[in-house]
């Protein structure tokens, strides 16, 4: 885990077009991209059932954020929040919710909790709201 400044988080999120941003903590730590990829494999191994309108994209994103909370505390996170959060976007003219993670390499990644896909967030979607 690497300490990252609020300024860096704001700069990275604003650069991809996020205007509605909620940061809940005063200090943040970023996991590595390798951790994020392993986390995706962990979630895929514990996959929950997709139920339209009941357990769909927004519930998957909340579940992933909760699991990230637990995993990062187990990995040694103390005295800071982390940079894995829930994100709303427009993708293919449809609303979608997934996760964004600013990693220790200072790259912002989109994380699809339903598949574990990790991809750079820039150009991935039209981002509307983020909560970290």
Predicted regions and their residues:
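A structural boundary/capping signal
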Residues: 1-132
């Amino acid at each position: 885990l690497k300490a990252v400044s609020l300024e860096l988080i704001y700069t990275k999120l604003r650069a991809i077009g996020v205007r509605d941003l909620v940061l809940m903590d005063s200090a943040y730590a970023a996991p590595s991209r390798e951790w994020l990829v392993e986390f995706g494999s962990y979630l895929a191994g514990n996959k929950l059932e997709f139920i339209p309108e009941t357990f769909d994209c927004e519930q998957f994103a909340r579940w992933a954020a909760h699991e990230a909370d637990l995993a990062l505390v187990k990995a040694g996170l103390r005295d800071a929040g982390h940079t894995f959060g829930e994100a709303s976007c427009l993708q293919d003219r449809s609303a979608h919710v997934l996760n964004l993670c600013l990693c220790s390499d200072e790259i912002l990644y989109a994380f699809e909790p339903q598949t574990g896909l990790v991809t750079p967030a820039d150009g991935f979607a039209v981002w509307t709201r983020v909560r970290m």
